[in-house]
Amino acid sequence: MKVNHSFLLLFLITLFCACTPKNIYYSTFSTTAIANKGMGVYVLRVQGIGQTYQQAKEDAMRKAVYDIIFKNVSSSYGEHRMIQPVLSNPLTEQQHADFFGSFFSAGGDYLKFVHELRLEKDKFKPQARRGVIMNVVVNRAALAKYLADNQIF
């Protein structure tokens, strides 16, 4: 009888622990250009989220390249101009889904056009999902040439 109660108690404790809320971070942080290095090279401040620190860094670099290709990126330097997206047609991503799927895959070609400048801050505790806000350098001109060479318009 004691064994049954022990198993029941252990089961209930496990069940209650599994039902506790998870620490998931949602943010409205937007990618911002903080410097223009000339020749189509920009320094961006971007946020990445992942289960590990390395995944969060990779997510940030992927997001920086994605935003340069598809979105207007606001600028916090000089005359506060927007950086126009490389591709202005919003349907291009859907039309070339296979290309962009492999381009943005882990270890994909997007890494040729971005590198970390320096880590800004690590905002999350080890037991939670990790997030980083970091500065990255994106070569927009080389990225535009690469997309044109692959006939992505």
Q: Which residues are covered by each model-predicted region?
A:
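A generic signature of intrinsically disordered, low-complexity regions enriched in glycine/proline
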Residues: 8-9, 71
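Domain-level marker for long, solvent-exposed, non-transmembrane regions
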Residues: 19-153
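Bacterial N-terminal signal peptides
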Residues: 9-15
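Bacterial N-terminal signal peptides that target proteins for export
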Residues: 1-8
